[in-house]
Amino acid sequence: MARSHDTKGSGGLSQRQLRVGEQVRHALAQVLQRGEIRDDLIERTVISVSEVRMSPDLKIATCFITPLGSADPQAVIKALASHAKFIRGRVAPSLAQMKYMPEFRFRPDTSFDNFSKIDALLRSPEVARDLSHDDDEDGGADEAPRNGDE
């Protein structure tokens, strides 16, 4: 009986894509941490690899990075992209079990920006006012008396 590997309907990645993506992320982070890439910008920038998403055929690894500090994210991505084949070769020994070594594509990780926007929205006076207004309307409905506690 064949299993269905179609994840398009569920909108998520397969377990294999997630596992391989995490292995690639770990191997890439080690290469960056050891300073194996000879590029002035990359050497003087601390780069966080927050996520690696693998294509369904595991041949393309989209790496989401965040340069920490004042480095321009687009400049760091351009530098990493210019060294993508070198990085691929350095990551290969850590991923020897893979049939094909993935092609690396680098993208800026904007999730941290999204988190800070949401946090700012939640802390805004309008939202605080609405939340306090909702609590007043409930009238303590969340705290129903228990048996014997009346």
Swiss-Prot record:
Q: Which GO terms describe its molecular function?
A: ribosomal small subunit binding
What processes does the entry annotate via GO biological process terms?
maturation of SSU-rRNA
Q: Which GO terms describe its cellular component?
A: cytosol
Entry-linked InterPro entries: KH_dom-like_a/b, RbfA, RbfA_dom_sf, Ribosome-bd_factorA_CS
Q: This protein's superkingdom?
A: Bacteria
Which UniProt keywords are present, listed alphabetically? Cytoplasm, Ribosome biogenesis
Main localization, broad class: cytoplasm
Any Pfam family matching the protein: RBFA
Q: Where is this region: Disordered?
A: 126-150
Its annotated compartments are:
Cytoplasm
Q: Does the keyword Transmembrane apply?
A: no
Asked whether the UniProt record includes Cytoplasm among its keywords, one would answer yes
Quaternary state and interactors? Monomer. Binds 30S ribosomal subunits, but not 50S ribosomal subunits or 70S ribosomes.
This molecule's function is given as: One of several proteins that assist in the late maturation steps of the functional core of the 30S ribosomal subunit. Associates with free 30S ribosomal subunits (but not with 30S subunits that are part of 70S ribosomes or polysomes). Required for efficient processing of 16S rRNA. May interact with the 5'-terminal helix region of 16S rRNA.
> What family is it from?
Belongs to the RbfA family.
Q: Which HAMAP family match?
A: RbfA
The name this protein carries in UniProt is: Ribosome-binding factor A
